[in-house]
C-alpha cells in the first residue's frame, strides 16, 4: 500500500491510499481542531473535487459497519473509481457530513457533487439498474454491467 500526504485546507495532511490502481483511492481527514464552518468547507471541497466520494465508517478494505460494507461492495462490483473518507477518524467530519447533506446516517455517497443517498438508496438503485445508468449519465466510468 502506498500513502501520499497532500495538504488540506485546515493545514493537516490528506492521507491518500491506493487500494487497487483502477478501482479506488481513499483519503482520511486527519484529526485537527476545526470550526464547524471549516469542517463544512473541507467536506465541500472534497465532494466537489472528486467525481465519486463515499463518506463511510471504516475503509473500503476494512468497513466498520454493514451499511458501509454494502455500498463499498456495490461500487467495487461496478468498478467505479471513488474516494472514501473514514468518518470514524474525525468526529468533526462525522458530524459535519450529516449537517452538510442534512441526512442523519452514514454512509453517504456523492457523485459529481450531488448527494445520492445512503446504503438503502444505493442498494435499491443498484438492484434496479438505475445506479449504473446514473453513473453513466454523470460521465462516471462503470466497468461492470449491473
Feature-to-residue mapping (PLM):
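Flexible, polar/low-complexity N-terminal or interdomain linker segments that lie immediately upstream
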Residues: 29-44
Amino acid at each position: 500500500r502506498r500513502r501520499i500526504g497532500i495538504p488540506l485546507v485546515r493545514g493537516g495532511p490528506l492521507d491518500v491510499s491506493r487500494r487497487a490502481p483502477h478501482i479506488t483511492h481513499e483519503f482520511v481527514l486527519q484529526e485537527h481542531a476545526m470550526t464547524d464552518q471549516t469542517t463544512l468547507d473541507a467536506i465541500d471541497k472534497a465532494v466537489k473535487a472528486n467525481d465519486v466520494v463515499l463518506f463511510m465508517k471504516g475503509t473500503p478494505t476494512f468497513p466498520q459497519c454493514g451499511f458501509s460494507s454494502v455500498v463499498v461492495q456495490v461500487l467495487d462490483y461496478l468498478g467505479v473509481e471513488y474516494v472514501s473518507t473514514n468518518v470514524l477518524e474525525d468526529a468533526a467530519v462525522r458530524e459535519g457530513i450529516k449537517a452538510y447533506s442534512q441526512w442523519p446516517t452514514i454512509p453517504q455517497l456523492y457523485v459529481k457533487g450531488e448527494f445520492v443517498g445512503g446504503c438503502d438508496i444505493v442498494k435499491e438503485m443498484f438492484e434496479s439498474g438505475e445506479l449504473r445508468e446514473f453513473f453513466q449519465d454523470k460521465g462516471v466510468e462503470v466497468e461492470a454491467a449491473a
